[in-house]
């Protein structure tokens, strides 16, 4: 196993522990707490994949961070902080919408890279809107936290989420996953719109009403892709 992979996991575990202590003091805002929950799932997945104990890794990560801080000058810290742009966290969904459980009558699922696409193919003839919470850096989508498809009644009928065991994705990965989700939903004669925030950063639509312009052949191809993977 690569030593950098292990040490990276150890540092991530310790930094998560620090953030958790911060949250326990009721100091974190909603985006902070949301990322904390997501990162916890990611660390569990990575720990399982690497065969490493999280508690042991946290202690090792603390030693690494302490060693770095001992060598770090205040001036170097200022320069490093200034050179890294702060991501903006954009939210279409409330915490309730993000954390709500949902069920599928006809579940379909596809894994595309490090993203998992899920939808209920029992849904037909509905008006659906895609909403997402994600971070942006340099005016580009950096990290997708969660994307969900909602009917006008507020029911959740689809979702795109990062796989905890496979962290890391690009804005193109997200665009492709959105295309697959839309294709599967429109196959059942649903009308799909994309939120203004998603249109701006993740899915640029040429239609004024926010409906993505997918040609029929592409929709059929995407729907078959979903159909073939459960």
UniProtKB/Swiss-Prot annotation:
**Ranges where the record places region PABPN1-binding:** 223-230
What molecular functions are annotated in GO for this chain? Answer: protein serine/threonine kinase inhibitor activity; RNA binding
Q: Where in the cell is it found?
A: Host nucleus; Host cytoplasm
After translation, how is this protein modified? Upon interferon induction, ISGylated via host HERC5; this results in the impairment of NS1 interaction with RNA targets due to its inability to form homodimers and to interact with host EIF2AK2/PKR.
Sequence motif: Nuclear localization signal, positions: 34-38
Q: Which UniProt keywords apply?
A: Eukaryotic host gene expression shutoff by virus, Host cytoplasm, Host gene expression shutoff by virus, Host mRNA suppression by virus, Host nucleus, Host-virus interaction, Inhibition of host innate immune response by virus, Inhibition of host interferon signaling pathway by virus, Inhibition of host PKR by virus, Inhibition of host pre-mRNA processing by virus, Inhibition of host RIG-I by virus, Inhibition of host RLR pathway by virus, Interferon antiviral system evasion, RNA-binding, Ubl conjugation, Viral immunoevasion
Q: Which GO terms describe its cellular component?
A: host cell cytoplasm; host cell nucleus
Q: Which family does it belong to?
A: Belongs to the influenza A viruses NS1 family.
Query: What is written about domains in the entry's comments?
Result: The dsRNA-binding region is required for suppression of RNA silencing.
Functional summary from the UniProt entry: Inhibits post-transcriptional processing of cellular pre-mRNA, by binding and inhibiting two cellular proteins that are required for the 3'-end processing of cellular pre-mRNAs: the 30 kDa cleavage and polyadenylation specificity factor/CPSF4 and the poly(A)-binding protein 2/PABPN1. In turn, unprocessed 3' end pre-mRNAs accumulate in the host nucleus and are no longer exported to the cytoplasm. Cellular protein synthesis is thereby shut off very early after virus infection.
Q: Spell out the subunit comment.
A: Homodimer. Interacts with host TRIM25 (via coiled coil); this interaction specifically inhibits TRIM25 multimerization and TRIM25-mediated RIGI CARD ubiquitination. Interacts with human EIF2AK2/PKR, CPSF4, IVNS1ABP and PABPN1.
Report what the protein is called.
Non-structural protein 1
Q: Which organism is it from?
A: Influenza A virus (strain A/Duck/England/1/1956 H11N6)
Question: Source gene?
Answer: NS
